[in-house]
Amino acid sequence: QVDVDAGQPAVNAVVNSHALTGKVMCGYQGWFTCSEDGGELGWTHWARAIHRPFGPGNAAVDLWPDMQEFSQDERYPTDFKHADGRPAAVYSSANKKTISRHFRWMRDYGIDGIFLQRFANELHSARLKAQKDVVLFHVRDAALETGRVFAVMYDLSGLRKGQVASAGNDWKQLMHDGVTKGSRYLHHNGKPLVAVWGVGFSDDRDYTLAECGDLIDVLKSEGCAVMLGVPSWWREQERDAVSDKSLHDVLKKADVLSPWTIGRYRSLHEASLHARRVWKPDLDLSLIHI
């Protein structure tokens, strides 16, 4: 076993799971299902009408996955056709072999690990929760197989007021089930790291900052380090961030902040400007509160 120093390529080495620092991490949604994968969830996230055939006029994706490396038992035929008349196939996140393949790609191309998205607004459904659990177990096994790391990320999008606590209850169950006990679960500052995405955004979310603060307290009480997915302008409390004096008090509870920057810049020059005008002052403020 070889520990990878912070910032070094992870190809063909076992990534250390002791800290987030210096790692290349990706979000992993694991939300694609197919009608014949055994989960009875239809073509989730492939098709607009998930229980109708996935074919022309019923697609929810903009791009088609490159299926060249997938084995036959990972291919789920659709109603789309290749030019030669063969049915075009896609993959399912419920297939253990496919998740293992994704993790091998991560190993081969220097990605250290993933934050597995766990959408909190679907945890009330036994069927949807079961699918998420299957993906989680496959991710855990694939990380062990390939020397990658993983951590759970709760996405609060879609929750109504009073529902945020469901994420804390779910996490307690996962802790009881031992999800953080394996060698591949990512830790930070000596604690298992759990992420919560969707804190402080100005897009009319129904749940409250107080609920988010309570959730952080619950996760901390379980002995975890907490990462928050926050708006780009959380520090200034403008544009994509709520203007609320309690926002910074909630964010101070966290160990790591991860600003959402999708669409905030469109070129390397704009990225450099964003880093200088936004990230540098963000970092300066954050360092005060370490």
Describe the function of each predicted region.
Residues Q1-K23:
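Mature N-terminal, pre-catalytic/accessory segment of carbohydrate-active enzymes
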Residues P9-A13, A94-H102, K132-V139, N169-G182, ...:
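Alpha-helical scaffolding within the catalytic cores
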Residues K23, G27-K129, D133, H138:
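N-terminal carbohydrate-binding/catalytic regions of secreted carbohydrate-active enzymes
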Residues E36, L144-I262:
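Active-site region of glycoside hydrolase catalytic domains
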Residues K81-N95, F115-A130, V152-A165, P192-D206, ...:
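The substrate-binding groove and active-site-proximal loops of carbohydrate-active enzymes
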Residues M106, A143, L219, L283-D284:
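A generic structural signal for well-ordered alpha-helical segments
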Residues H248-S286:
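Long, well-ordered mid-to-C-terminal structural blocks that present hydrophobic/aromatic surfaces
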Residues I288-I290:
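Conserved small/polar residues in nucleotide/adenosyl-binding loops
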